[in-house]
């Protein structure tokens, strides 16, 4: 009798829990299923936590250079040291270069002249790279380089020495041992858009445009909205787009077309929005950055608006990311934030406007002072001078490579 009573009680208890529906799941035969309420947070606790993170980050922060002009680009020195470290014990042999050739375009500096493979997968990207290499060849010793112009890095660190290498790539995660170099887009070959049909480039010119635009729209005149405009290269961006549709007074975020666009499904079941210039991003206080296929070329531009940058995910890196510090220069968000997480963090900064402006100003200052064209040139120079010391063989000419420069009248 006792056993039967226990069974009945257990059955009543199971039925009373509501099963799958109360767990936030909908069964196949249900006509409708109420969405579960978003997680509630204690606003005071959340605010206290964010303030503590900001205070600690700024207390721990040390400027990357004691020289205000940072004339030797020392701010980025740790990155190239770390990237070259795997080859310090082995050096770089001719066999390593030959086995890595399939991962990129072969460049050769020989006799103070620059040569490369006849076939460049992305000519505009090679143009952007060569813009920085050509002025350096007169001062550099002979060397061979494998430069990857694809979006994605090539050498998985899990492969160890079997991965081959070295290979130079513009972006990577910790799972790769590629050597980062300043992307071609600092000069040419960036993503082609309606506003930039020949591709995003000329960082020198864009810096000046954005500096003027930021000065013309002071913080007090910016719209207190989160803003994003870009294509759907990753579904990580979806929750911000959906939040914008649900709460347009908080966020203005829409998808644009990219080269693979076929229908509104590619823009999350909505018409594709028009592109917005980087200069017009400066109208908004809160700007969002996401990775694309790899690191986003957008990030460096956003800082120059003197707007608060929200950087989603920290996996993908470019050479200059290392000295951009979370809560000092930007607001870090984990990958795939929920709509509620966006709401909470935006609400905090709307209520703490002075804090938002301080972080925005520090982000602007860092990019303006430490990502100048002379910093790009300096990084290339230091990177190649350190790299060539690793070579363990005599570099020889190769007839199959084509001559790039310098031009005859420059010799």
Swiss-Prot record:
**EC nos:** 2.4.1.-
Q: Which residues cross the membrane?
A: none
Recorded hits in InterPro entries, A to Z, give: CAP10, O-Glucosyltr/Glycosyltrsf_90
Q: What is the effect of changing residue 296 to A?
A: Loss of enzyme activity
Impact noted for substituting residue 124 to F: Slightly decreased enzyme activity
Share an example GO biological-process annotation for this protein: protein O-linked glycosylation
* Molecular function, one GO term: EGF-domain serine glucosyltransferase activity
Pathway annotation:
Protein modification; protein glycosylation
Where are the disulfide bridges? 64-75, 73-378, 120-126, 282-305
Tell me the PANTHER family matching this sequence.
KDEL LYS-ASP-GLU-LEU CONTAINING - RELATED, PROTEIN O-GLUCOSYLTRANSFERASE 1
Give the protein's function: Protein O-glucosyltransferase. Catalyzes the reaction that attaches glucose through an O-glycosidic linkage to a conserved serine residue found in the consensus sequence C-X-S-X-[PA]-C in epidermal growth factor-like repeats. Regulates Notch signaling by glucosylating Notch in the ER, glucosylation is required for the correct folding and cleavage of Notch.
Tell me what this protein is called. Answer: O-glucosyltransferase rumi
Name the species this protein comes from. Drosophila melanogaster (Fruit fly)
Upper taxonomic classification of the species?
Answer: Eukaryota, Metazoa, Ecdysozoa, Arthropoda, Hexapoda
Q: Which gene encodes it?
A: rumi
């Amino acid at each position: 009798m006792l056993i039967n009573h226990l069974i009945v009680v257990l059955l009543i208890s199971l039925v009373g829990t509501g099963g799958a529906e109360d767990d936030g799941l909908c069964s196949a035969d249900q006509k409708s299923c109420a969405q579960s309420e978003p997680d509630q947070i204690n606003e005071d606790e959340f605010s206290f936590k964010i303030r503590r993170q900001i205070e600690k980050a700024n207390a721990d922060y040390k400027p990357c250079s004691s020289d205000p002009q940072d004339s030797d680009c020392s701010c980025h020195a740790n990155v190239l040291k770390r990237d070259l470290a795997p080859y310090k014990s082995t050096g770089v042999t001719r066999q390593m270069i030959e086995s890595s050739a399939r991962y990129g375009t072969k460049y050769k500096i020989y006799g103070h002249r620059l040569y490369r493979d006849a076939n460049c997968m992305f000519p505009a990207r090679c143009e952007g790279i060569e813009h920085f290499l050509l002025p350096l060849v007169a001062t550099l010793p002979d060397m061979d380089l494998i430069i990857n112009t694809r979006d994605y890095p090539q050498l998985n660190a899990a492969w160890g020495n079997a991965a081959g290498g070295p290979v130079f790539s513009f972006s990577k995660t910790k799972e790769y041992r590629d050597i980062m170099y300043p992307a071609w887009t600092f000069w040419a070959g960036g993503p082609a858009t309606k506003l930039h049909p020949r591709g995003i480039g000329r960082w020198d010119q864009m810096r000046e445009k954005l500096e003027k635009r930021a000065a013309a729209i002071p913080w007090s005149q910016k719209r207190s909205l989160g803003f994003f405009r870009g294509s759907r290269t990753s579904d990580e961006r979806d929750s911000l787009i959906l939040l914008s549709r649900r709460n347009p007074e908080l966020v203005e975020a829409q998808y644009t077309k990219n080269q693979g666009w076929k229908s509104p499904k590619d823009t999350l079941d909505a018409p594709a929005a028009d592109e917005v210039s980087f200069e017009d991003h400066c109208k908004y206080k809160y700007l969002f950055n996401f990775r694309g296929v790899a690191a986003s070329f957008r990030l460096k531009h956003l800082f120059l608006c003197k707007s608060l940058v929200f950087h989603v995910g920290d996996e993908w890196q470019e050479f200059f990311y290392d000295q951009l510090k979370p809560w000092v220069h930007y607001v870090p968000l984990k990958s795939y934030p929920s709509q509620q997480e966006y709401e909470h963090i935006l609400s905090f900064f709307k209520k703490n406007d002075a804090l938002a402006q301080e972080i925005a100003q520090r982000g602007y200052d860092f990019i303006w002072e430490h990502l100048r064209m002379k910093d790009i040139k300096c990084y290339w120079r230091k990177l190649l001078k350190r790299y060539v010391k690793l070579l363990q063989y005599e570099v020889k000419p190769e007839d199959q490579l084509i001559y790039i420069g310098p031009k005859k009248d420059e010799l």
